[in-house]
Structures are given as structure tokens and as C-alpha cells.
């Protein structure tokens, strides 16, 4: 065999191989690479969108937590205010009740003192009448001298 013929046959075989690769294998391979690049780009874009969505969701969660804390603090403040109102109302009611009880006790004391004074006046009147009877050695008519005895009792 001739070296030129071998070289020419190899060159033709190589050219045929290049032509087959360029027409049959290269386009599908490039399409597959482009599709893969496109999928990777879409995946990266989806990851970016997901990251943005996550950041937005995190902001919403933080805002909701802030609102919940604010509402909880408001509820706690309202509960404290209500508790203070209840305590103040109970204190005022206790003061009112104590004042009422004190007034009732004072009224009872005054009534008892008045009864004691009245009893004492009656006893003094009776003693005065008895003493006068003994001094005069005669009985004084209580009905006849009642006005005089009442005046004497009121002075005592």
C-alpha cells in the first residue's frame, strides 16, 4: 500500500467523521447543553425568587409578632388598669361600709347614752321625790307636780 493512499484515506475518513459529528452528534449535544444551561438558570432564578419570598415571609412574620406583642401588651395594660379599678372600687366600698358601720355604732352609742340619761333622770326624779317625801314627812302627789319634776329632771 501506498503511504499517500493511506494518508488520503485517513484524511477522508477523518473528514467524514467530522462531518457526521458536525451534522448528527453536535446539534443534539449543543441542544442538551443549552437545555441544561437553561434549567440551571431557571433553578438559580427560582432560588433567588425563593430567597426573596423567604425574606418577605420573614418580614411578615416579624410584623405579625410585633403586632401580637403590641396587642398582648395592650391587653396586659388593660388588665392592670381593670385590676386597679377593681381594687379602688373595693377600697372605696370598704371605706363606705366602714363609715356606715361607724355611723351605726355611733348612733347606737348615742341612743344608749340618751337612754341612760333618761333612766338616770327618772332615777334622780324618783330619788328627789323620795328625798322630798322623807324631808317633808309626807307624800308628794307626783301627778300634781309632774311639770315641776320634769323641769327639775331636765336641769339635771
From Swiss-Prot:
SUPFAM superfamilies: F1F0 ATP synthase subunit B, membrane domain (SSF81573). It is found in: Cell membrane. The keyword Membrane applies. The keyword Ion transport applies. The chain crosses the membrane at residues 3-23. Keywords: ATP synthesis, Cell membrane, CF(0), Hydrogen ion transport, Ion transport, Membrane, Transmembrane, Transmembrane helix, Transport. Its main location: membrane. Belongs to the ATPase B chain family. F(1)F(0) ATP synthase produces ATP from ADP in the presence of a proton or sodium gradient. F-type ATPases consist of two structural domains, F(1) containing the extramembraneous catalytic core and F(0) containing the membrane proton channel, linked together by a central stalk and a peripheral stalk. During catalysis, ATP synthesis in the catalytic domain of F(1) is coupled via a rotary mechanism of the central stalk subunits to proton translocation. This is ATP synthase subunit b. It comes from Stenotrophomonas maltophilia (strain K279a). The gene is atpF.
